[in-house]
Structure formats: C-alpha cells, structure tokens
Amino acid sequence: MDNLQVSDIETALQCISSTASQDDKNKALQFLEQFQRSTVAWSICNEILSKEDPTNALLELNIFAAQTLRNKVTYDLSQLENNLPQFKDSLLTLLLSHNQKLIITQLNVALARLAIQFLEWQNPIFEIISLLNSSPSILLNFLRILPEETLDIASTSLTEVEFNSRIHELIDPIAEDVLKFLVSCIDLLQNTDGNSSSSISLEQILRCLNSWSYEFPVEQLLTVQPLINLVFETISNGNESDMEAFDSAIDCLCVILRESRDTTNEQLISALFHQLMLLQEKLLPTLFTDHPLNDEYDDDLLEGMTRLFVEAGEAWSVVISKNPDFFKPMVLVLLMLTCKNEDLDVVSYTFPFWFNFKQSLVLPRYQESRKAYSDIFVKLINGIITHLQYPSGQFSSKEEEDKFKDFRYHMGDVLKDCTAVVGTSEALSQPLIRIKSAIENNNSWQIMEAPLFSLRTMAKEISLTENTILPEIIKIICNLPEQAKIRYASTLVLGRYTEWTAKHPELLEVQLQYIFNGFQLHEGSSDMQSIITASSHALMFFCSDCSKLLVGYIDQLINFFLNVQSSIDIESQFELCQGLSAVINNQPEAKVSVIFQKLVDDNLRQIEALIPQWKANPTLLAPQIADKIDLLYALFEELKPRYNYPQQGSEPLLPRIEFIWKALRTLLVDAGAMTDSIIVERVAKLLRRIFERFHVFCEPILPSVAEFLIQGYLTTGFGSYLWCSGSLIVIFGDDESFPISPSLKDAVWKFALSQCETFILNFNKFDKLQLNDYHEAIIDFFSLISDLIMFYPGAFLNSTELLGPVLNVALECVNKLDNYDAYICILRCLDDIISWGFKTPPISTVSIEIVPDEWRKQVINEVVIAHGNQLILVLFIGLVTTFENTAHSDAISCIVKCLRILTEANNNDATICIDWIYKVVEQLGQVTLNERDNLAKAVVEGLNSKDYRKVREGIRAFVGWYSRKNINSRFE
C-alpha cells in the first residue's frame, strides 16, 4: 500500500460498478477494504477530499473517501498517535469545503465520533458550533447526527464509563441552546435566499428536532411553541408541496407521542389528542363516509396519518382503556384506518395497537370500558373479514399471492383479539351472518371463503361451552354448496374446533361424514390434493382431540386409511397415522394389540414388497421404504405404556414392538439396508421414539438393538447410529427415573464407550481441512457425549481415556465448523463439562448434592489447566469469525467458567488470567495496548469481585469491537 496512487482507488471503484467478472470485482473489493484499514488511507483520503470538484466529476471517489474517513475515525484512531489535533483541524476544513449532502453527512459522522473518542479535546462541541455557525446547513446536519451517535457505544473503543461520561459532557451543556438555535433557524428559513450556499430546509430543521427530542422530557419540549407549531403546521399542510418535510414532521410527532407514554400529565395528553383530531378533520375529512380512502387520498398521506394515530394509541393504551367517553373518537379513527385502507402493509401498522388495547380491556377492572368499546371491535371483525377476501381476479405474481396469504394469518391474530373483547357469541355471529348472506345471494366463493377463514383463526379464543352459535355454524358448514375452495376452507375450520367437538359429541358424526365425503367427491379433480391435505389434517385433530369418542370408530377409521392411502401423498398419510395413534392408545387393553397389528402388518407387507425393487435400484426406492418406516414412527406418536414399570404389569404392545424390530432387523442386516443412509436414518428415528415412549419395557430388545448399533456404526460410520445410541443412554442411564439395575446401567456405559471409541477412530481419519463435510456426524457425537455427561457424570469425568480425546476433538472442530447446530452442540457440551468444576452440580439430581472433590480435580487438571488456554483461544477466534451472534452467550459462558475455575484454583486471585488474556490477544493480532488492557481489566476486576456479568460484558464488548474493526466489511 506504500506506493498507492489515487488512480488505483478510482480504478477499483470503477471495476465494482462495471460489467467486469465477479472474480475481478471481488479482487477490487478486497483491495478497497485493505486500503480502508491501512495507515496511508488517512493522507490519501485527505488528498482526495481537498481537491476541488466543481462539476462533481469525482463524486463517487469523494463519497468513498468520506466513508473511509468515517470508518478510520471509528476504528483506527490509534494509528494517528499524537496527530489527532492536526487531523481534527483538517476534518473541520474539509467539512466546510464541500456542499454535497452525502459527503457532508459522512464527514459529520466522522466529526461526531471524533468528538466522542478524542477525550483530550476540550469543549469540542462549542468549537465545532463556532466554526460552523457561518454554515447553518452543515451545522444543522452535524447537530442532527450528534445525538444519534451518542446512542451507540459500539462505534467507539471507549469503556462504558468513559463513553457515558463523555456523552454527558458533550450533550448536557448544549441541549437547550440547540432548541434556541432551531427556533432561530425558522426565522432564517423564512428570510433566506433558497439558492444561497448556506440555505437550510424545513426538512433539516425537523430532522434535527427529531434527533434532539429524546434529550428532553416531553413536557419541556412541548413548551417550545415555535418548534411544536412548526411540526403541526407542516403536517397540517399535507404532503403535496413538500413530501420530505411532511415525512420529517410525522417522524418528529411520532417521537413526541411515543415519549408521552409515561407522562401523568392528563392535560398534555388531552392537548395532543385534540391536535390529532384536528389533523384528521383537516387532512382526512371524509374518513367516516362510505368513500374508498385510496381513491380519495394519497397513499403516503394515509401512511403518515396511520403512523401518528397508532403511535398515540400505543402510547396511551391504558388511559384510552380507562376513558372511553373521551378517547372513543380516536379509536374510531384507528378503526377506519384499519378497515378502509386497501394497502394491507399500512393496515398492519395498526395491529400492535389492537393487541395492546385488547390486553387492557380483558382485565376485570376495565369491564365497563370493554362494553363501551365492543361495538368498535365488532366493526373491526367485519372490516378484517373484508380484507381477508381473495380478489376476484388473478394475482399479478406468485410473490403477491404468497404475500397476501401470509398477511391473512397476521390479520387472523387481530380477529383473536376481537373475540377476546366481544366474547364468543358476538364474534361468531359476524362470520355466520356473512355465510348466510353468501348462501342466500349465491355469492362467489371468495365472499364465502373469507368468513370461513375468520372462523378458523378465531378458534383458539372460542369458549368450549358455547352452545348456541357454533352448533348452527357446524350444521351450515356441513351442508354448504359443493365447491372445491369452499370444501377446503370448511374442512380446515372443522379441524380447528375439534376440542369443542369433544365437548359436543352429538355433532361428531356429521363432521366426520363431511370429511370422509371430501375424499370421494373430488377424486380426480385438480383440487383433489389440497382437499386431501385439508381432510387429513382435520382428521388428525379429530383423532387427537376426540380420541375417546372415536374408540368405537377405530375399524372404520383404519379401513378408511387403508382405502385412501394409495391415492394420498405421504404427508397426508403421516398425519392420518398420527391421528390413528391417539385413537389406538385409547383402545381397551384386550384389543389394542390386535388393532395395532392390523396397521403394522399392512405397513410391513408394503416394505417387504419394496425390498426386491430396492436391491435393484436403491437410489430410487430407498426414500419409498424410508417413508413407510416413517408411518410406523407416526403410529407411535400417542402410544404410551399401560403401566409405569414392567413390575406392575406386562405391556400389551411389547410383542408388536418385538415384531416390528425383528422385521426391521431383517431388512437392515439380512437384506443389507444397514449401509443405506436414508433407510438407517428413519429406522434410527423410529427406534428413538420407541425407546422414549416405552423406555424400560423395551429391555427385551435392548441387547439386539445395541449390537446392531455397534456393528452398524463400525461398518458405516453413519451418524444416525450414534444419534440413536443416545436414546439408550438417556433411558437406561437414568436410574433415578426408572428401575435400572447397576449391571444394566454399566452395560450401557460400556456400549457408549465402544461407540465413542469408534467415532474417535473415524475422526482421526477425517480430512481436517474439510470438517464441514462431517458436521452431522460431529453433532451426533457431541449429542451422545452430552447424554453421557448428564447420566454418567462421574464415569465420564474419571475416564481420562475418553475425556482427553473428547476435548481434543472439540477444540479442533469448534471454530472451524460453519454449521450452527454443530458448533453450538460442541459449545454446550464443553459448558456441561466445565460446569462440573464447581461445588454445586449443574443438574438437578437426588444422588449428588455436592460435586465430589475427585470430579472437580479432574475438571481443574484435565480440562482447565491442561486445555484451558487453548480453549479460550479457539473460542475467542470463533467469536470473531464463525460463531453467529446467537451462539456468543454460550461461548462466553464457557470462557468465563473456565477463568472462574482457574481463579479459584489460584486462591481466588484472578491475576493468573492476565497471561491467558494476553496470549489470546497476541494470537488474534491487530489489538492496541489500550484495547488489550481494557479487556484484561474487565476480566480481572469482575473475577476478583465475583461480578461475572462484568466479565461477560467485557468479553462481549471486546469481541464486538474487534469484529467491527478487523473482520467485518467496511466497504459500503
């Protein structure tokens, strides 16, 4: 970078915006990022920005230079060492020499960040204001930016104490003077020549006011009449003449309304309320007429007004709930803005208000208010149903259709809010009236479908004791005119009310018949698939929620499934099997085995028939066999043992479980499917479910399953075998929950050791440069290790031949894996191990009140002392490279616990950690002494005072700063 020329930067910028190859663009981008981090960037950017450019021929170059300076001030001030005063002067000079808005904004951000970080600069804001006074437009821009920058400690390298102290020093002395300056700008605006270089705009004044609004109590701000009048007058003038100023005023008033949330000054709220209502009367005079809003008013005007009323509604939700007589007109405005606007994106702005309003109104103390507002919520139900209606024509694109469908679910949440307020009967009456009207008038399917959809979304809020409206609705639905889309919608409605049906068995038969008919009436039609999907989904819920009522229907249900399964997709088959599982589970003990066997026999016959085809074409047929195995998995969804333990009685389904395992073992071992990863994965999934559901009742098949899992994993290395092995550990290692003999528990420990040894042998053969290719196997291994730590903590910690290799694998993998599930699994496993180094056990267990000293010594010696330095290094590297933000808490937890144990082992003296911190920083590189010392100070002080939050926050702040400074892209 030493011989860099300005022309090199121009060439790179041109390349990025040209038609050059992506490879060339990436190289240009990399070059520019290297430049932005270099020391020479300071002087070159100054050189670029110092050149006159009257025709804006070099605008892109100048913007890049200004952005680079902003980033340099943010991250690289340490490069300037003792030259900060000279840079400050040059930055102010550059600021006054430019008139392009984008450049001025970037330089002002740089100036604000410099003022915050350059602690030796005394009274910086007064100096800046004095210098920029002759250029009010630039000064306004700076003053707008300054408070925004004081919100973000992440854009500085300061400690929290330094940052907060500096902010008070910069903001507090000038806050009231800024308001006076803004008032003077109003006069200047009225008298200035719009073409002068120092001219200011109404938008600038309002944007600046918006930034500073947070610095004052709302009561104080509202006393500055010239500014408040300006806000309301600008909005009152509408958005036709000055759209930017209108938007700025809307933003400003939204802040004021938001800040009024906590005020107890009723006069203030009353005054704002009246001003809002005056704005509505002025700008939306026909809001309450039948005229369509979007035909009469500009979309941006409607959006702005919606934002204002929503902001007020959310801020005053409690007082609105208390005073319906006073605030009802405002709620009516929100009702109209919700129901009459065709722009559904803007309509959605109102949804949080309705939710929060509902939260208040359902409280007992607002019972009278709820009655007063009920008519509004009834109208809201009807307005939402209208919005739910599909358009009569086609959507312009698939994207538009998907967006509308997603939006319907959000609108459904509002209907739930309405139902909670007006009550079950009143809420149900609204779609019922519309359905009856649609039938009488023979309306299009769109008009019928919308109220049906609304019924679907209301279901969770409907009382299970409702006995008047819902029976009528159910009967009407089951006799609706036949139309595919109506059939689809009505079937889904029935599926949502199955809990209600369980309390009203007299309506079960008619609903089941309606659903069964749906499979037959539309067979062969283009809509058949969607109807089958809806019917299967509904039947699943009927079987689940009405399982006891359906005990006598089991033969009919099974025959129905066997008849239709060949004509329905696998997802629908799966859902039906899930539903059947619930009904089977409620069968009498004497019958359950025979009934279950009927479905099992059919399934296994189909698998057996597929085996010869699979042998001929495994790639094509393996998924089909796997799907059939998945149906067995679904059949175990609701099945449970009849007794808690085998000593209480024999399990009637155990012979069926043994039968299933024998058939699957034949497929896997005799037919050779144990080397087919797709089939093995589904079998592992099924076995896990069987063991989780029937736990110790499965002991008769345990030896055979364990032998198969050992042999299968040894032969193939498939992670599924490890994943399934974990379920054996969870069941037969848990001697507190189940009657497990010591010999059986020990046998499962030896089984687990064998699986771990096989993984470690396999891992040593992995290509370490391609670890991401093995992430699934790594997840399965560390999931198994987590199970071992949970149920065999002592055996695991004292097994040095296992503990050491596990740590080595973890440290080699954790920051090299891109897969989130993989590295988070390792992090949590490491955390589990380290947590046993404290006196209090990390799990709730009857048998261990205090962690044995022998276990703790193992953690101290074999984990912290032997691997701790490397552990925190790899975790720090992961924190600044591969780990997503959501994994940071887990990684930092491991680091802090490791340092805590090290400190405790050193007679509670945390200075021993300094050397580790310094080594980490040295390995990371590109860390200033100040940044290093701030990290070490936060860690040591926090550990010594047992303020572990301080340690975590110190590490988090360092990681965030390091990533932004050295890792994240600076190029915009």
Curated annotation (Swiss-Prot):
Primary localisation category? nucleus
SUPFAM superfamilies tied to this protein: ARM repeat
Question: Where found, per UniProt?
Answer: Nucleus
Signal sequence, renumbered to the chain: none
One Pfam family from the record: TPR_TNPO3_IPO13_2nd
UniProtKB keywords: Nucleus
Report the superkingdom from the record. Answer: Eukaryota
List the Gene Ontology MF annotations in alphabetical order. nuclear localization sequence binding; small GTPase binding
| GO biological process terms on file | protein import into nucleus; RNA import into nucleus; RNA localization; snRNA import into nucleus; tRNA import into nucleus; tRNA transport
Its Gene Ontology cellular component terms are: cytoplasm; nuclear periphery; nucleus
Q: Does the keyword Transmembrane helix apply?
A: no
Known function:
Involved in mRNA transport from nucleus to cytoplasm.
What's the miscellaneous note?
A: Present with 6340 molecules/cell in log phase SD medium.
Q: What is this protein called?
A: mRNA transport regulator MTR10
User: Whose protein is this, by species?
Assistant: Saccharomyces cerevisiae (strain ATCC 204508 / S288c)
